[in-house]
Structure formats: C-alpha cells, structure tokens
Design a protein with these regions (language model features):
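Short linear motifs centered on Gly/Pro in flexible linkers and helix caps
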Residues: 7, 36-37, 52, 61-64
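Amphipathic alpha-helical binding modules
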Residues: 56-82
C-alpha cells in the first residue's frame, strides 16, 4: 500500500533522524526495522541528514547486540553509497 504524507522532504528526513537516534544502541526489534526502513527509503533523506546519520552511526558508543551492530553497519554502507 502506498500512502501520501503531508510535509516536505526536510520534515520526513528529520523524522527519520529521530527514528535512527531512538533506535541506535537499543537491543530490540526496532533496530532492524528502523535500519531496513531507512535503507529502503534513502530518497527521503536530505544530503545533510545522510551526513548526520553517518556521523551518528560512526560515533556510536554502543550499537547494541552483535545482530544490531550488523544492521547499523549495513545501513552505514548504504548511506555512504558503498
């Protein structure tokens, strides 16, 4: 199902930053869900916010469990275009 969202790219991009920051370091299902959603919707991020996410993920003190770290590193690669 496709949905329409009221707002502009900057609004959506900022909300995705909030989701990333909420999930970073947690040890729950939300990590995988967040990483997959952001990774599959990179077109919704501004270039500035991609840079913010890269900085957040690279500077994380704790990624959570090993499976969470793998999710974050996979998202980081996507954000960097690797």
């Amino acid at each position: 199902m496709t949905i329409d969202i009221n707002g502009n790219q900057e609004d959506i991009s900022a909300m995705l930053i909030g989701a990333e920051r909420y999930a970073l370091g947690r040890r729950t299902y939300i990590v995988q869900w967040t990483c997959e959603f952001i990774g599959n919707n990179l077109h919704l991020l501004t270039e500035k916010d991609k840079g913010v996410m890269i900085r957040d993920i690279e500077g994380a003190i704790d990624y959570g469990d090993e499976c969470d770290e793998a999710c974050w590193k996979a998202l980081l690669s996507k954000l960097k275009g690797v």
